[in-house]
Amino acid sequence: MKKTLSLLLTFLLVLSLWLPALAEGEQKELIFWTRINDTFEEEIAAFEALHPDVKVTRVGVGSSYDDLVTKYIAAAVSGELPHVGLLSQRYGIPQIYDAGVLVPIEKFMSEEEQNDIMAAYWERYTYNGERVAVPFQSSMPVLYVNEALLAEAGVDVPTTWEEVQQAAAKLTKDTDGDGVTDVFGFNIPDDAPWYVNALVREAGGEIIHEDGTVSVDIPQMVSVLRDIQQMAAAGSMPSNQHGTAKDDFKNGAVAMLFNSCAGNKSIAKGVEDKFEYALVTFPAIDGNVSAPIGGNALGIFKSDAETEALSWEFVQFMTSSDAVSGFTMDKGYLPIKYSFMETDFVKARLADSFWAATFDQVQHLQGQRVNPVDATIWSELNDILSEIESDPGADVEKLVRNMQREVDDFLLDY
């Protein structure tokens, strides 16, 4: 793949030599906000090679999507906004859109272009009846399994949530007999609410409704949280160790891990050759598999017509087949368009035993409706998880009722 990227960049750079050169002062600047570590150096270089009259200035704003949202809201007041920005799928889009600074992405797209985007993405990036951003680096949750530990314990790869719980108990071990667990059967990283929402949806729960109302106090939410509480109480899942879950899996201290498909490069680097692991389909409930969309989108901010048009050219390039296959999907992210499923890259992934289950799971992609209360739900769920994992006697139903009140209060004041 590195060879392919090098050839692509070489081709674009050669092509740029045939395009008219402009003086530095005549260049049009595009401001592109991302998180600090999202450099996009290769992508920007490739775009600039095709557009020598354009200078893309990437500005890293904070280390998290929280920081980005805070900066966008502040910039909406000051007027110092970027032309293009990275938007988290998780939260912030409603607030930014309601501030009146975001141009609906559908304004720039033909009907054919919109129809090529997989429908699940529009579920997530539609707000107030408008398609406000275009999916970019998109991911979904999968189950990572340490194949060596499963084989040693004689445990089959689980395909359901119930089987995950059963397998976790069998995989949990005190290897040296000192009374301290050395290998936990299962854990969830610090983006735990993402996986909880997936399980709730698989169980038939709907959190954000079409009319904008929000229901978190539902039986499916209580059931999933009780399962997690019981696993922590039984010791098959460590209590409140979400922050180290990925590293623990890399070191063989956790046998099964919920994680993003886009997290594989980091996992592979950490595991090295210590053991074999696999990415398998997210475990089902009642035969239902839910693959909620993660990752981010690209949004265009209001400016003049010429700059907005140029911003759309940049977004088009970043979400094109060549760019996504050569850069984005190579990092573990997903195809965002139906047409991408016919590319050589995706066909190769479907034929690759390591990636086949992940790319086959694309058919189960689901986008939870965007809502201003997203961040509140996320925060409340993290608080509940912290309590129920440390207290086996915590009243899950009461905690969920309290979360519903927080949600209702937020929406009442919004």
How would you name each of these model-derived features?
Residues 26-36, 54-59, 83-84, 132, ...:
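Short, well-ordered beta-strand elements
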Residues 29-44, 61-65, 139, 191, ...:
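Extracytoplasmic "Venus flytrap"
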Residues 46-117, 124-126, 148-159, 253-256, ...:
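Extracytoplasmic "Venus flytrap"/periplasmic binding protein-like
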Residues 49-50, 55-57, 78, 152-153, ...:
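Extracytoplasmic/periplasmic substrate-recognition and gating elements
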Residues 88-141, 156, 165, 181-188, ...:
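Hinge/lid segment of periplasmic solute-binding proteins
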Residues 122-123, 273, 277-280, 329-383, ...:
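Long, aromatic- and glycine/proline-rich binding clefts that accommodate carbohydrate-like moieties
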Residues 167-170, 211-239, 282:
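Glycine-centered hinge/linker elements that transmit conformational signals in sensory
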